Design a protein with these regions (language model features):
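Extended, histidine- and acidic-residue-enriched regions that form the cofactor-binding/catalytic faces
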Residues: 1-80, 85-93, 97-113, 121-275
Length: 275
């Protein structure tokens, strides 16, 4: 999340001076606001997996479409992981206030299209509602680019069955993005104990990834359904850096295409204040 030796990123808000932000907002009114989590990811992956992944994708996408990438907002909504040490969660009320304040700040500075880029399933329902609130209560319009889009990419990459947490997909992503943080010797397939109705819905997920939200909504505490904190029916040992690069490139391209389609549908940028 913070590499002291990384080169300056001209689209990443923490790297910019205020005059540089001023110049950027006169070219574009799009800001990408990424959301991750600080929560357990099984015995082999870092607790910051969601955060590390989404900020890398959001930054790469912002460079492709000439948008501002705000810093990731974390921790987030992870109460279902609290039986595992290291997880930090916010209440829904606190999370909503933080999101609304961040979006209001960006809108005030002239970023009138705010993309909520979500990298954690536990945030999805709240962010869908908050995108609506941002549009109604601030000067900006907001859309959510969320987990359904990621699921479509997983299926294209032939990720096995239900693989939503610390499985093949996220292991691959971390092996590509942050291999030094992966404890490969501790990778193991969990014993899963999902409710029968969720098991039955898995067949539908193969055809329509957006249905995954109905499996994960109201999910019991993770320690009750997984032996090690991973939520997958696949084998994390199948994760590879090559597959991680494939997922990363596809996710960046999908996010960039989403922003460009939004621009095409809604017209040119709104001039920034004083611009």
């Amino acid at each position: 999340m913070c590499d002291l030796n990384e080169p300056k990123d001209a689209h990443y808000l923490p790297h910019l001076t205020w005059p540089e932000v001023d110049a950027l907002r006169r070219r574009t009114d799009v800001a990408i606001l990424p959301f991750g989590a600080i929560e357990q990811h099984g015995p082999a992956l870092p607790i910051g997996t969601d955060t590390l992944g989404v900020i890398a994708v959001a930054r790469a996408a912002s460079r492709k479409v000439d948008a501002l990438c705000a810093p990731v907002l974390f921790p987030a909504l992870s109460s279902h992981h609290m039986q595992f040490p290291g997880t930090i969660t916010l209440s829904e009320e606190t999370f909503a206030r933080v999101v609304m304040d961040a979006a209001s700040s960006l809108a005030r500075h002239g970023f009138r299209r705010i993309l909520l880029a979500n990298g954690h399933g536990g945030n999805e329902a709240a962010l869908a509602y908050l995108a609506y609130r941002i549009t109604r209560e601030t000067e900006a319009a907001s859309l959510l680019f969320g987990i359904a889009e990621l699921r479509k990419i997983y299926l294209t990459a032939e990720i096995d069955k239900l693989d939503i947490h610390a499985g093949i997909g996220e292991t691959s992503s971390m092996l590509y993005q942050q291999p030094q943080l992966v404890r490969s010797e501790r990778l193991e397939q969990p014993k899963m104990a999902l409710d029968p109705w969720r098991e039955a819905l898995l067949r539908q997920v193969r055809d329509d990834p957006s249905l995954l939200r109905y499996i994960t909504l109201g999910l019991p505490p993770v320690h009750e359904i997984s032996s090690n904190g991973c939520i997958t029916y696949g084998d994390p040992h199948k994760g590879t850096a090559a597959r991680g690069r494939e997922l990363f490139d596809a996710y960046v391209a999908a996010m960039a295409e989403f922003v460009e389609a939004w621009r095409a549908a809604t017209g040119p940028a709104v001039p920034a204040p004083g611009g």
